[in-house]
């Protein structure tokens, strides 16, 4: 009974992997459960919007509960991500924001995270410049206590489904 579930889960993860930029700009494959319809352009960097028609019914539930991020524990165990840090972005996002948001690439000074200071202070509701502001605060005050604080602040975000799309 478990085997078909594991195979199905593995296929959902494998089919929805993307390249992101991590610490120092190093590319890595990020793992996620598929929550959107597969795009014809696999690296299509459109931002997700509220009531986005590309999000599937199951994907909506995964995103509301943040379970679509669960496979990123693999990235953490492989040393590509941390529990706390700026969220990793696609290379095309960095290319698009170069020159538009000053110092956006400075986010790559630390390991990207599953959650971050920007996520507990607005997440999807923040524009890239606002996210960068919070990411820079995190980078400049990075500590074990700050990480613990961010993790504790993440709990109500997950359970209240705040900031989910």
What is the predicted role of each segment?
Residues 48-111, 150-158:
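A short, structured surface patch at a secondary-structure boundary
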Residues 10, 68-72, 135, 147:
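Acidic active-site catalytic centers that drive phospho-/nucleotidyl reactions
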Residues 1-13:
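Single conserved hydrophobic/aromatic residue that forms the stacking wall/gate
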Residues 9, 40, 80-81, 124, ...:
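A general structural signal marking secondary-structure boundaries and capping sites
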Residues 17-54, 114-133:
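Short, glycine-rich, amphipathic interfacial segments at transmembrane boundaries or analogous
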Residues 103-165:
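C-terminal terminal-structure detector
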Residues 3, 85, 140:
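Small/polar loops that bind or transfer phosphate-bearing groups
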